[in-house]
Amino acid sequence: MTPKRRKILQQILGGLSLSPLATGYLWPTTAHTEETKRNRILVVLELSGGNDGLNTLVPYGNDTYYQYRPNIGIKENEVRKIDDHFGFNPGMSGFEKLYKDGMMAIVHGCGYEQPSFSHFTSMAYWHTAAPNSGERTGWIGRLGNAMVDRVSSTEIINIDSAQSLAVKAEGITPVVFDNPDRFLRKGLFQERQLLNDISRLGACKSEACQFLSDIAVSASEATEIVREAWERYDKSVDYGIAPIDLNKIASLISYGLDTPLYYTSFRNNAFDTHVQQSNLHQRMLTYASDAVAGFFEDMKRLKRENDVVMMIFSEFGRRVPENTSLGTDHGTANHVYIVGKSVRGGHYGTPPRLDDLDEGDNFQFTTDFRRVYATLIENWMGLSESEKILQKKFEKLQIFS
């Protein structure tokens, strides 16, 4: 499909108020062979609500942590220690194994200047990679635009109940779905009927009719491919109690799509732990840890473990001191986790100091989160356009060999 034809189809698709089913055709394709980086996949997992980084990666070697958190601090004998300073929450056996296997890079102190404590605003900053700018497209969307010529299926798949701002783009339309068994066109009844009628017309006598016919066929085929991928998918790998849609992503990778960008989230502000945090937070972390570990076990089974990297983030961390409700309030800097067989595991960036908090008892950020994005864009996806995509040049981290 030519770029012009693709663009017109997308404009018509948007004009008909359909769910964004396809940017072109969702054909399963064989892998590109001319360049290794063309096989590479980036999966982004969002932990919505503001995950408490301090009780996720516990600085058990620092007494100040326990002074700030006398009731909800994770006891040293319960921590899953990964070195002399840090250890994971007791519920995170999956993360512990990934780190000790050398598959996890932990980027400390990720944030931005003039941080917002609003879920909506801070998430928008992370989604757009443009704090305080009013930017309306997402960084994944702009990355997808830069990769249009690399793939023959859709550039971005967003598994969620609604499209994330992170994947919003100009010129391409991500595939967005939630349940593979109920992946349907969501337009008005008359519009759905129109496309169904057009798809049965056969030969079209006008270019406009042919465009609409292409849309109808593409939408129908996208629906069938998502369903068929899920039905064919070998669900033998254990993702734990809550797979967080990572098994759905695995099903599409298994099916053979050459889609390079996937985005999903642990939804509904699940990590917003203001009250009675300890048990709830550990349970949420167990779900996430088990699901991520299961996903990479699945990639190993599919022989794609060298092709896939996952970024895990939250819109902000939590305030350092516990509150009077045995929870934590909205904070600032947090960890970002980069996971994959191709990752150089270890610690990156400077951990914020517990004895140098801001006036609100929050961490001072030490790593601009867009350094992580720039690293993934250039050193993983193999594009040189990170400055254009991020609208500024950022120093990269040495996460990849």
Predicted regions, residues:
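Feature for exported/extracytoplasmic and membrane-associated proteins, marking the mature portion
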Residues: 1-302, 321, 335-401
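Conserved H-loop
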Residues: 305
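C-terminal, helix-dominated tail/subdomain
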Residues: 325-336
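Acidic/histidine-rich, metal-coordinating catalytic segments
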Residues: 309-316
